């Protein structure tokens, strides 16, 4: 039995995170360690995207959100930005048939209008081609930042107040959440960052309020199924309390388990 299967056997398949978000960091360092161009690291990173997307789908994870290109990434050298834009469009065109085959549905988050027209067209074609899929929801964050998202949500809420359709006293957490680009997506249960840095870099700040955080030194191009399983095993080893005590969580879990047992009898 290989190492991957050994790790799969350690998982409780009934307690997998519904939603996993990943900050894919380390492409540039991976390339530098091999005396390659940064663009080579990004190309290799695409292989990891394909690998983890397929594996997430196979495991039955419902939502996978990938931080592919941040608002801040526009500040990178123009040659690198151009290479990334080309790679994004090429990857979507190439991988869409396999996504359809594997029942994976594409969602796009971020300021998509800022992307080059050809890339937008490729992305929209991919989204349209997978619109009927009912398996894994693949959320691709492009030209995205959480501060942009929250500012945009605040602006929309202010417009509703100005129009008289919303009272300031009626603004709630649900009101804000409904104006985010993730309005129809559950909050991440697990946020993974590869590459060794331990920060969340303006990514899903609102949505990750109660997410479990997993930081790994593994560079994104090297992030394979075994590394992903280690993150999932780490997630399942934690107690998610959401402000409650351990005793309360234990009691709720026992009641839920008893209820499930009763229904199955």
List where the protein language model places each region.
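Flexible, compositionally biased loop and terminal segments
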Residues: 1-265
């Amino acid at each position: 039995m290989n190492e991957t299967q050994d790790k799969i056997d350690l998982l409780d398949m009934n307690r997998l995170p519904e939603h996993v978000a990943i900050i894919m960091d380390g492409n540039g360092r991976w390339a530098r360690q091999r005396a390659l161009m940064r663009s080579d690291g990004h190309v290799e990173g695409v292989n990891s995207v394909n690998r983890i997307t397929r594996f997430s789908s196979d495991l039955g994870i419902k939502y996978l959100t990938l931080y592919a290109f941040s608002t801040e990434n526009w500040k990178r050298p123009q040659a690198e930005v151009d290479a990334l834009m080309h790679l994004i469009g090429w990857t979507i065109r190439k991988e869409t048939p396999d996504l359809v085959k594997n029942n994976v549905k594409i969602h796009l988050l971020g300021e998509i209008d800022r992307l080059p027209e050809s890339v937008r067209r490729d992305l929209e074609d991919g989204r349209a081609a997978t619109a009927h899929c009912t398996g894994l929801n693949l959320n691709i964050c492009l030209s995205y930042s959480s501060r942009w998202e929250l500012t945009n949500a605040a602006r929309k809420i202010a417009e509703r107040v100005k129009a008289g359709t919303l009272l300031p006293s009626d603004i709630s957490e649900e009101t804000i959440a409904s104006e985010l680009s993730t309005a129809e997506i559950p909050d991440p249960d697990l946020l993974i960052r590869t590459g060794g840095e331990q920060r969340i870099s303006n990514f899903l700040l609102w949505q990750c309020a109660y997410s479990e955080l997993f930081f790994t030194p593994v560079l994104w191009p090297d992030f394979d199924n075994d590394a992903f399983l280690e993150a999932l095993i780490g997630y399942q080893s934690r107690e998610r309390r959401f402000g409650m005590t351990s005793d309360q969580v234990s009691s709720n879990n026992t009641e839920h388990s008893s209820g499930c047992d009763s229904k199955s009898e």
